[in-house]
Amino acid sequence: MKKIFLCVILIIIPNFSFGFEKTTNFDLNKLFEIQNSGKTIVINSWNEYCSTCAAQTKVFGQAMKDFKDVEFLFYEQTKHEDIAKALGINYWTTIVVFKGENEIGREIGLVDKKKIYDLINQGI
């Protein structure tokens, strides 16, 4: 019984702890369309088994509420190698900020909310 309870908890908790379910929410055509609009774009690569990615997800859940005029785009690194290659992203946990077509900043492995927000603010 304890094992069943533990399994249920391990399944339920991840679905509620991040505030949103991180999925791939764009393709390259959508990215180019948003870039042409001149908007600020934040791209984050992730992997479902990555603890740093999970920590970033918590920050991005709040950031999407705090930066309403910014487009947040996420993709699963190992399942969308075309996106990774086109953007020159080699690692999970990479955060790239664009202002339109111009890359403003790029960091790998940030989990500190202030540092992530500072990176986002560079594109605003």
Where are these regions (language model features)?
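Sec-dependent N-terminal signal peptides
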Residues: 4-13
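Boundary at the C-terminal end of the N-terminal hydrophobic targeting segment
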Residues: 17-21
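Thiol-based oxidoreductase modules, predominantly thioredoxin-like and allied folds used
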Residues: 22, 45, 64, 69-82
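A short beta-strand-turn-helix
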Residues: 22-40
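Short pre-active-site segment immediately N-terminal to redox-active cysteine/selenocysteine motifs
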Residues: 38-41, 45-49, 91
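Conserved redox-active cysteine motifs that mediate thiol-disulfide chemistry
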Residues: 45-59
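Structural micro-motif
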Residues: 87-96
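Non-catalytic, surface beta->alpha helical segment in thiol-disulfide oxidoreductase systems
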Residues: 99-124
